[in-house]
């Protein structure tokens, strides 16, 4: 925003949570668009909110925002490889994401992007790089930039080959497993973990993530009853005992059973570890 000469204090409208644990309802999004839609150029939201794990309805948001003349983009860092994403059918104008979370490409790996086909040949402001130039004439080094049809035309330079290698293997695994099947297992895994936490760790942990499976992915964000210091102590204990989660300030532990390689036994092992910590 600053790069384009705008002051975020004046040009940015931030949605405020209207539900517990920082969750944002569709009603809140609709209210913001009704109030400000005529002066909003871009609606930019996550597919899944990184801290609390809330998943957003891409198609519903896009449809609503388009009625107000807004361009719509999504940050899918925590959604890609986690939820089935029908980006074209959602109508979103564009989306961006990384591959080092659920898609297992490792830190620093190349990112990904989607641009809806209705913008494929549009003359739009862009950072134009030689790798986005028409492949048939790319090496002629002509004076005019001729973009490749579609999202490839937004590429700047050639991708890092070594970081593509693990991504190629991972994407092949996802292709063979199938996102529909992975989502079905994910619903069962995270649902099982939720049930274990609620039935065996009541009074120790509280769940921040929406309880509706349609409003979340694999991730469960949890807080430890008793405050931040106890939460951090539990997180460190889990890490020391080989259970890898993630800590997000001020007081959230993120646990994400990944259906490609996590088992139901892993969910049970997490709960048993928390029990051991709570009673030691």
Report residues per predicted region:
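Pyridoxal 5′-phosphate
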Residues: 1-280
